[in-house]
Amino acid sequence: MSREFKRSDRVAQELQKEIAVILQREVKDPRIGMVTVSDVEVSRDLAYAKIFVTFLFDNDQSVIEQGMKGLEKASPYIRSLVGKAMRLRIVPELRFIYDQSLVEGMRMSNLVSNVIKNDEAKHKEEE
């Protein structure tokens, strides 16, 4: 009987929860601000983890770059807190990656909304 989920998937899910809590409560770096953990991918041997993050309310590229630098600087501290919170033989090395999918999704949603408004305005003019 095969398992429904791989162990790396379960670890990634738990890691996402723990890192979100740690970033919210423990990390005091002002560069980080309102950060959201959107996804976590863990390697099969659980040695590496890619943490995909987005910054809420920040569209400025320089603010995002500063936030990413802050996360990279805090990475060893976050890893140590993850090690205390989760019972793992090997605590994964954390790599933070900026996730643009949320920003792109909002942009696409705005484009669709604008097209719908323009289409409705044209139909009202024709009547």
UniProtKB/Swiss-Prot annotation:
Q: What's a GO cellular component annotated to this UniProt protein?
A: cytosol
- Mind listing the UniProt keywords for this protein, alphabetically? Cytoplasm, Ribosome biogenesis
The listed locations are: Cytoplasm
Biological-process GO terms, alphabetical: maturation of SSU-rRNA
Q: Which Gene3D superfamilies match?
A: 3.30.300.20
Q: Give the quaternary structure.
A: Monomer. Binds 30S ribosomal subunits, but not 50S ribosomal subunits or 70S ribosomes.
* Protein name, as recorded: Ribosome-binding factor A
